[in-house]
């Protein structure tokens, strides 16, 4: 445990260094975006509008990668530059600075950005959990295999405070009548480090996303709770208000292409496995067997989910601004 806590503290000391790296990243990204825009010039010599859209190498973003590879964005008449980030923090900074006009992510970030006077709205839900597919779980390390959930919660769960991870942990524990006040959060913001600490018994338990949940199970960890069924883990497509207002046709075309890609994934799961493995960073041991996610029809984010996350943010005093559903969700753009 002491080794695990030392590793977590070392990670916290890296924060200032990470901020410097993000500043460098934004400088590089600015050059990259400009170069890509010039490539989109039409035959008349005038630059075609480009939607710079931020995403992460995760399973829920698969339709974005499929739409790009299958040419669906082009078919819909929209030029899209998918800007890939390795962390949500990098993506959020890029959105805040205007380097990207839209992004893929959880329900929480748009609310935090909007509360900090960066006008962003969610236009569609691209993925949600069902009874047959999970996306997040709390797992116990092999050394805690004989301990009960209450004991493990108090011993400590590796995760990240004030993030969607903590929200999911709180809601999953509440489903077992365990109040969030009992949770001993061990701060480990890096997901790969969290996985490593779990598998090396440096922490009693950890919160992880798929496909790392399945990988951890293969290596001896035990799933205590997961989000299959409750529909807690919606991921959304969000845009800056300025872009929504000035380029509504581009947003609709983008969402139409994503909807087409989602349907293609559902009809042809074997055909997209190679794209998933490559773009969503599926670990090698799982590349032939991990189930291809099933994607729902694009819908507006469910008001119950949006408001539950918002209330949690208010309770935690992460968001201190009062907002309505209409200030967080943009209607009228779905295909």
Regions found by a protein language model. Give the residues of each.
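Short, low-complexity disordered leader/linker segments with a strong preference
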Residues: 1-48
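Ligand-binding clefts/hinges and TM-proximal coupling segments of bilobed small-molecule sensing domains
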Residues: 32-35, 159-178, 257-287, 326-329
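Short, glycine-/small- and polar/acidic-enriched structural segments
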Residues: 41-179, 185-188, 204-208, 222-223, ...
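Soluble non-cytosolic domains of exported or imported proteins
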Residues: 58, 85-89, 104, 159, ...
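Pocket-lining segment of extracytoplasmic ligand-binding domains
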Residues: 108, 185, 192-278
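Secondary-structure end/capping motifs
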Residues: 245-320
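Conserved C-terminal helix/tail region of periplasmic/extracytoplasmic solute-binding proteins
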Residues: 314-335
